[in-house]
């Protein structure tokens, strides 16, 4: 598929972090100064996840008040509109934006306001995914998820767990997400972005609807069978995973393997600005490097719709746009 066709294709994005995807003009406006591209995005020679994470400092400063949060949400939907994303689930960590004046309720409401304005102006259907952070206390994470649960179906669509997977394995968070499931809150979980496949097993067993990344089940047919049987979506973020060295080389990236195993793979950006990417660029990348056929692009969009945290009426609407 040519780039222009890919750009105009109606697209679905399920794994996109708000703070890692703010546009340079938005960040410059918020900071009141010119920002160099290298302050925001990693180069092709990114050496590690730590180098990658350094790029979140500036955008993080831009979302510490309600105007910044609302503006950030609108800014991201504006970017998505430029490449015909018709449904998007945007994730962020409310606790990272909390201040003495702004609790997680106000944080979540501010993001929803920006999303609603973006939906009104661009026609993009959206859902907000709230991220619990691995380094935060169980009490704080649970407090945030309980608050977010009040907005389920009114902007919020799911919860997530993000942060340093290597330091905090999934086994430490089973109680939180068992409780989240009891509350009727859907969730996706970052798991297998680094080398521990047990995190994927634990995530599936606790009831995750989707897995963020899932790279660690490469070559492991047993876990792949478990994921397939559970019907979980696999949110793959190719360019980001290569930059953070989740895999050592392009040849090791398991997109073709996962598709051939019948997993519900979707393609995502992860962090548009930090990775200097877009959904169009990601799709072009996987076609050029992994022999992804045109019909498989549509299959992955269908996988994204099938595993989206939204109601059937919106799924039907998006399906019609793809035909």
Q: Where do the protein language model's features map onto the residues?
A:
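Metal-cofactor-binding active-site regions of metalloenzymes
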Residues: 1-185, 194-199, 205, 209-210, ...
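Short HxH-centered metal-ligating active-site micro-motif
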Residues: 190
């Amino acid at each position: 598929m040519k780039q222009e066709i890919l750009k105009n294709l109606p697209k679905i994005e399920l794994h996109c972090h708000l703070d890692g995807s703010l546009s340079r003009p938005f960040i410059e406006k918020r900071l009141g100064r010119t920002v160099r591209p290298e302050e925001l995005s990693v180069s092709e020679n990114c050496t590690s996840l730590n180098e990658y994470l350094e790029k979140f400092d500036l955008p993080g400063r831009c979302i510490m008040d309600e105007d910044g949060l609302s503006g950030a949400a609108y800014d991201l939907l504006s970017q998505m509109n430029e490449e015909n994303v018709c449904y998007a689930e945007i994730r962020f960590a409310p606790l990272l934006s909390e201040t003495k004046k702004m609790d997680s309720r106000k944080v979540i409401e501010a993001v929803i306001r920006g999303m609603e304005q973006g939906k009104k102006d661009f026609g993009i259907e959206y859902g907000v995914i709230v991220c619990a952070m691995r380094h935060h206390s169980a009490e704080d994470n649970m407090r945030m998820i309980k608050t977010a649960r009040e907005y389920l179906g009114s902007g919020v669509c799911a919860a997530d767990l993000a942060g340093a997977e290597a330091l905090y394995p999934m086994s430490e968070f089973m109680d939180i997400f068992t409780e989240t499931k009891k509350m009727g809150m859907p969730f996706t979980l970052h798991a297998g972005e680094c080398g521990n496949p047990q995190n994927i097993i634990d995530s599936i067993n606790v009831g995750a609807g989707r897995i963020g990344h899932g790279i660690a089940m490469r070559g492991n047919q047993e876990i792949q069978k478990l994921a397939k049987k559970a019907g979980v979506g696999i949110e793959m973020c190719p360019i980001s995973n290569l930059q953070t060295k989740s895999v050592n080389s392009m040849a090791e990236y398991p997109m073709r393997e996962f598709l051939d195993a019948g997993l519900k793979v979707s393609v995502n950006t992860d962090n548009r600005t930090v990775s200097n990417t877009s959904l169009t660029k990601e799709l072009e990348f996987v076609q050029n490097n992994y022999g992804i056929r045109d019909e498989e692009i549509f299959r992955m969009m269908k996988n994204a719709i099938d595993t989206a945290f939204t109601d059937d009426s919106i799924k039907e609407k998006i399906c019609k746009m793809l035909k």
